[in-house]
Every structure is written in C-alpha cells, then in structure tokens.
A protein has these predicted regions:
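Basic, polyanion-binding surface patches
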Residues: 1-173
Length: 173
C-alpha cells in the first residue's frame, strides 16, 4: 500500500465488555476489505460533526485510486498498538485486531478486540473521565448524517433510588 487508507463504515458497534470487542461490517468488494483481511488490524475513529463532509468524501472514493487522507485534508497519526494510522482530528480512536470474520451476505462481519484507545484531552473532564457529550460526534442512519447532542440519561436511571439519583446529579455537575 502506497498510502494509508480510510474507510467510512456505517455498521459498527461494541459487542463485548471483557475483553473489549467491537464489530464492523464491510463489503468484500471494497478495497479496504482486503487491507483489513490481510493485516488483521484497523482503527475505528469516532467522527465529530465538524468532519462529516470529510467522512462522507472518504466513503465516496476508493483508496485504490485516491489518497483519502490528502483528499479529505486529514492527518494520519501513528497508532500505539497497530500498524495502521488513526485520524489525528478525531477525538477518540479505537485500535483493533481482528479475531474472526463472519460472512453475512452482502457484507462480512469483522469481530475485533480493542487493543488500545486514543483519547484527545478535549473530551476528558477534570478528573480524566471520558465525556462523549464534549466530542460533538456524528452518526449515520438510513442515508443521513446526524449530530449527536447532549447526554439525556444514564444506564439504570429508570430504577435507581431517589437518593442515588440526587447524589449522581451533584457529582455530575
């Protein structure tokens, strides 16, 4: 490969906590499919809304013919644990190693362990906790892009006792 590549993936998600694992779904005809298959590695870069045009552009061209980092004006940055670069402008990057590939029909599902996490300090609070609401991330669904907004709740909030809810509110401020 002459230059690092970027693939825009619509279907991805966390699938396990311990070990931390995620999945991406990629069509076998894609240039990136073979790069991932051969290297056994990839990076999932969570995209902020301000970069959505660049992400869309990366999904419109093949890396076989275009240097997507250059065309989208993005910066490749060395990863901690995998050979492929992360995107410097993204606030959160998940470095992954493939554990399994499952054919699904039009796409193959890559299962991968998350082997390193790269976090920009701008999305951390004063105690070092990750605050995704600060990342101003974007999402894709049914052919449209959406800006993700503020946090609207926490896991377990529907059954938490009133005193616990009150203490959570105080510590989150």
């Amino acid at each position: 490969m002459e230059h690092p590549n970027i693939i825009t993936v619509a279907w991805t998600g966390l699938i396990n906590t311990q070990p931390p694992r995620l999945s991406i779904s990629v069509r076998p005809g894609r240039y990136s499919y073979h790069l991932i298959r051969e290297s056994g590695e990839f990076v999932v870069n969570l995209t902020p809304a301000r970069l959505i045009r660049a992400a869309d552009l990366c999904g419109m061209y093949t890396g076989a013919k275009v240097d997507k980092f250059r065309k989208a004006q993005l910066t490749p940055e060395p990863a901690q644990s995998v050979a492929c670069p992360l995107i410097a402008e993204c606030p959160l990057s998940l470095e992954c190693r493939v554990t399994d590939v499952l054919p699904q029909g039009t796409h193959d599902l890559f299962l991968a362990d998350i082997v390193a996490v790269d976090v920009d300090e701008s999305v951390l609070d004063g105690t070092g906790r990750l605050r995704l609401d600060k990342a101003e991330l974007a999402a894709f669904a049914h052919g449209e892009y959406f800006a993700l907004g503020r946090r609207i709740g926490k896991f377990g909030m529907s059954v938490a006792r009133r005193d616990i809810k009150k203490s959570r509110k105080i510590t989150e401020s």
